Amino acid sequence: MRLSFLPTVIVDSVTQLTPELLKELGIRLLMLDFDNTIVPYTTNVPTGEMEKWLKMMLSSEIQLCVVSNSKRDRVKIFCGQYGLDCITHAKKPFSKGIKECLGKYGIPAENCALAGDQIYTDTLGANGVGVKSILVKAIDNHNFWLKARHVAELPFIFCARKRRVE
């Protein structure tokens, strides 16, 4: 597909993504990054707002699947609590995990999106296979390297600033 560091849509949190907005964008399957998108790196416990959003989304017509580069057990335990499908060791920005998810659901790439907090993994990976990319603000910039990476992403965020959804 295309090599692009620019997200299709920018939001502050996945909790801003409603079934109505996703349907407007033509999205039937929302893939979610795990760490710093749904929960911080330091815990598997979502905020009350995130838990409420997950339950609302699970009762909608939008399919959800966690696609994470994280270790299997940590993600599977979380997803099991909410009845979420998950794909671990996704190797984003490479296409392995995203293509596995597309194959599992049988939904065309143009009707799918990947929401995540990293341009160099989530956005690039999604764009590379023709899936819409949704950049979310990281839940927690808890260390120097995450902060540095987010600073390096600022030029791309600036270029895509008109794609922000309030």
What are these regions (language model features)?
Residues 2-32, 39, 43-44, 48-114, ...:
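Asp-based, Mg2+/Mn2+-dependent phosphohydrolase catalytic module
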